[in-house]
Amino acid sequence: MTERERYIEALLFGRPDRIPFTPGGPRKSTLEAWRQQGLPEGAYWMEHLRRQIGLPPEPAIERIRPAADFRMIPHFEEKVIERRASTLVVQDWKGNICEISDKFDTRYLRDAIDFVTRSWLKCPVETRADWEAMKPRYDLDAPGRFEPDFVARGRRIGERQHVVGYSFPGPFWQLREWCGFEGLCMLFLDDPAFVREMIGFWQGFVQRMLERIFRVFTPDVIHFAEDMAYKEKAMISPAMAREFLLPCWRAWCAQIKAAGVPVIDMDSDGYIGELIPLWIEAGMNVCDPIEVAAGCDLNAFRRQFGRRMGYTGGIDKRALARGGQEMRAELRRIEPVVQGGGYIPGCDHGVPPDISWPNFVEYSRLLARMTGWL
């Protein structure tokens, strides 16, 4: 099977020859720790890992992904506003003003380079005037929205072997980026009409973006980024999510399904058990990363939702950090879901630096056996 066929078959309860091997990805601090623990300096971690556990190199295939940018254009200026004793007050590319450790800079807020905690001081949409100033940044015809040869590249990949998909924020995530979490929560109560207006704007922008993509080719997966849960609970009630968010999710899913995209993947950290029924109703068929520390339990989800929902992730990062018998027990815990299909197992978020390189190698070897690679 090709990589693409295997991915789709695995998530849609088909008959893959093997399950995709996706142990999880490290960030900068993790790689720095690993280089002190046995990962050679200069070695690409995945290539070295595969060699160390006895997997062949990843196939050398041409990987084309026609670029389409769902983000604001232009970005806000990234700048340092104030230097404090051990922190920086900065403006990020989205227009947020926040405080971060002086060990980092604005690049860490632009890309997921590392695990960065920040304090939010001001968000770009706090008034109606701010909102009117924000909207022009989502011009569909802005330079750079689609790469110049988007159509030509899209038409080249009809018989591709690799997975091609697009990711963009869901309505909750996007409005939180504009208004801030507390600001958005207050707007749900104080000015619901404004919330609906912003959701409608974002829904329409995404639909027009997808329409242009689907004219050229059909991706394999569309991924919604929608972090909207804490430990044990969602950030807003399921009733409020149904009222404000479900219409947008449903409209997107209808458009995506009509285009023939096989996988619609919802990404939310935290405990998502009370949200999954809404996602199924909207038309999504996969979700991730299934964070165990938040209370997510793949076995319980599978019993409750059956084959209506597939998953990626779901392996407790804390057990991987502890290693040994606890790590092996964690892999045994998820094995029934692996065997039942509709699941690509992996670490339940970015791989943190407390997972040592030796533990990660052992975990990856066990995972490769479980998924049919060894």
What are these regions (language model features)?
Residues 78-82, 105:
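A structural signal for short, hydrophobic beta-strand segments that form beta-sheets
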Residues 30-78:
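Segments that shape or occlude catalytic/ligand-binding pockets
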